């Protein structure tokens, strides 16, 4: 799995109410936060600032400029053929707790 988070990278939200939904990084705020968008009309993720610990990067990337609008992101996703991929939800990996783990 790719561990690079850069503008245009497709990511999966792993925490919060949008867990399992895919989004695209449109801006990097600092070393801890990025701005992502679904766009909401496509994957259900609205444009927002998120902690990088709450997302998991994928190996997919689209060509967009920093701060691209939702319309520009949607056009880039269509050009890359990733529209159906973005609509699919991913089941977040949950920790498996065994009886030996409980003390």
Swiss-Prot record:
Molecular-function GO term, any one: RNA binding
PANTHER family: 60S RIBOSOMAL PROTEIN L14, LARGE RIBOSOMAL SUBUNIT PROTEIN EL14
Keywords: Ribonucleoprotein, Ribosomal protein
GO CC field: cytosolic large ribosomal subunit
Name of the protein described by the UniProt record: Large ribosomal subunit protein eL14
Family: Belongs to the eukaryotic ribosomal protein eL14 family.
Record GO biological process: ribosomal large subunit biogenesis; translation
Disulfide bonds: none
Transmembrane residue ranges: none
